Every structure is written in structure tokens, then in C-alpha cells.
Amino acid sequence: RPASYTGVDKDPVAAKHVRELVGTRGTVINADASDTGLESGAADVVVGEAMLTMQGEKSKKAIISEAVRLLAPGGRYAIHELAVQPDTIDEELHTQIRKDLARAIHVNARPLTCAQWSQLLEECGLVVDSVHTAPMALLDFSRNIRDEGFMQTLRIIRNVLSDRELRARVLGMRKTFRTYQQWMCGVAIVAHKPLKGEDHDAQ
């Protein structure tokens, strides 16, 4: 069990809300993930949840580099992101998925292949330890119940049904995810910051 937890959120309202939920069990700061202001080398583990997919290449690298700065040598960085598959996917199809996804969720999402995610982490100085994928189930009802609980899922559905604009957006997202379901997946990658003298290319 970690000695302490520190959460980082760029949205001050979200940071305040999580801070109230966490209470004395951890710390939550309002900061950018690419420039947290936290102490270098003080973290044993850094976790990024569905954050990098929504960033451009420059921002992706900035956030990962900040995670590397925060980690002590041997510390681990774990990410959970959206990926496209297979690694040999046609570039034209990959581009079309990115465009349609960005149009559906109103964010310039840029999912990578699993190989590209691993390469990005390695370019920032990390050693990839494991890569695991799972079917894309972001808007799957049964998955939502497992993740959020029955009552919370009902509240989400109520909010969606009562807001025409939100409803149209969610339905658009669902349609896009279903259209490209066979080429999209969730990916979880764990990498570590090399120890002094460790071969960066060692897997």
C-alpha cells in the first residue's frame, strides 16, 4: 500500500471535487500534467488514465516527460489509453479513424497503435515492461454497470436523455465506436524509469 497519493487535475472544479472525496487519504493539486510543480524523483508510481489519447504529439511527449521527471529510478509509469489495431493498420484507415473520432467527441483525439504507444514511451526514456489490450467497451451498457455501478449508470443515462445536445453527442460517439470496433481497443502499458547503469533497450 503506497505511503501517500497525489492526484493532479487541470480543472480546478474537478480538483476541488476529488479533494473533497479523498479527504485525508491523499492530496489533490490543480496543475497541468505536463508541469505539475511536484518534486523530481519523489514518486514510485505514476498513473495516467485516458489522458494521452486526447493530446497532440508534442503534448503527449511533454506529459510523459513530466512523469519521467517525477519518478525515482526504477519507478513505474502505467497508462490506460485508446489504441488502434493491428500495428500494421493501413495509414489511410488510421487517419480516417482519428478524424471521425475527433468529429464525434469534439476533441482532437489521436489514438496510436500499441507499437506506437510503446515507442513513444521509449523515446521519452522509459523501458516498456508489459502491454495488455482489451476490447473497446467505452459506451457498452454492461461494462458501464460493472465500472460505475447500477445507480450511477442510471444517473448517467438520465442526464444523457434529458439533454438533447449531449444525447446527440453520445449517440454520435457510440456510432463511431461501433463502426470502427474491430480496429479499436483499450491498451494498458506499464513501463519503468531505468536504474542508473541499466541498459535502456533491455526489455
Model-identified regions with their sequence ranges:
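A short acidic, Gly/Pro-enriched loop at the edge of an enzyme's catalytic core
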Residues: 34-46
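Class I SAM-dependent methyltransferase SAM/SAH-binding core
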Residues: 1-36
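Conserved Class I S-adenosyl-L-methionine
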Residues: 130-203
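A short glycine-rich, Lys/Arg-flanked "PGG" loop and its adjoining helix->strand segment in the class I
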Residues: 61-76
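A short SAM/SAH-binding and catalytic strip from SAM-dependent methyltransferases
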Residues: 44-59
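Residues at the starts of beta-strands that form the adenosine-phosphate
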Residues: 4, 76, 127
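Short alpha-helix
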Residues: 108-125
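Conserved class I S-adenosyl-L-methionine
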Residues: 77-100
